[in-house]
Amino acid sequence: MKTKAGFVALIGKPNAGKSTLLNTLLNAHLALVSHKANATRKLMKCIVPFKDKEWYESQIIFLDTPGLHHQEKLLNQCMLSQALKAMGDAELCVFLASVHDDLKGYEEFLSLCQKPHILALSKIDTATHKQVLQKLQEYQQYDSQFLALVPLSAKKSQNLNALLECISQHLSPSAWLFEKDLMSDEKMRDIYKEIIRESLFDFLSDEIPYESDVMIDKFIEEERIDKVYARIIVEKESQKKIVIGKNGVNIKRIGTNARLKMQEVGEKKVFLNLQVIAQKSWSKEEKSLQKLGYIHRRNRD
């Protein structure tokens, strides 16, 4: 069997559809998806197998990154750092741009990325044929910069094989780097954490999801059930009250939604215990971000 393998950084502005694309390619719910922009905070590896036209069995390891953006808050700086590191570590990059975005995001990406890349135009199912053609023509001025320009829709599964074929063509022959059926090397406790965060985005409005995070205090993995004890961290006491809700109605909804998603991903029953705490300025404190896994002591960039 001829094989290829390689790391591919998936880069884009917030809400370009990176996580939706990966979940569709995996046919599983691993990456955090929200209609709110900039939900992804940590890099995640997602492993997609693909047989290309030259009969290579390719193992494409996508690095799902936080959206490219610039803010002074320490948490946001950590998120940008992860995206930049992924670009440096990858063999190839895919820049995902919404058909509705202007070209500024791609131009910023060009100033940051030194690796060969594919430009993918997402959400084409939400635009007219004329709008898609117009956007493709706008990007053609940069045709000397990208390896290929691929219009696609993750929700409608349009042109996804074309994207994978293009990626596979530019990977080097190599033995596979991970086991055959592995979709991610993420620990289950980290996947569960992201599922809880996704539920916060699903049920809470305004700034609260952006000023909150999740700490897994205890994770007990048994044959038939996973037991998860977690804290939702917010910035203010007023936010804590909203997360809990009157008579606990909000926290119950968040918990039930998260637990059902966990059971689907983990393929077993899940016991979930959620607590809510207020910790002022947690997103600006290095010690707090270390505990949450955004900063590593050996590498604080």
Curated annotation (Swiss-Prot):
Protein name according to UniProt: GTPase Era
Organism expressing this protein natively: Helicobacter pylori (strain ATCC 700392 / 26695)
Record region (G5): 152-154
Cellular localisation: Cytoplasm; Cell inner membrane
Start and end residues of each KH type-2 domain: 204-280
Region (G3): 64-67
HAMAP family for this protein: GTPase_Era
Annotated positions binding GTP: 12-19, 64-68, 122-125
Positions of the UniProt region annotated as G4: 122-125
GO cellular component, one term: cytosol
Biological process (GO), any one: ribosomal small subunit assembly
Pfam families in UniProt: KH_2, MMR_HSR1
Signal peptide start-end: none
NCBIfam families: era, PRK00089.1, small_GTP
Family statement: Belongs to the TRAFAC class TrmE-Era-EngA-EngB-Septin-like GTPase superfamily. Era GTPase family.
Domain of life (superkingdom): Bacteria
MF (Gene Ontology): GTP binding; GTPase activity; ribosomal small subunit binding; rRNA binding; small ribosomal subunit rRNA binding
Cysteine pairings via disulfide bonds: none
Annotated CDD domains: Era, KH-II_Era
Taxonomy of the source species: Bacteria, Pseudomonadati, Campylobacterota, Epsilonproteobacteria, Campylobacterales
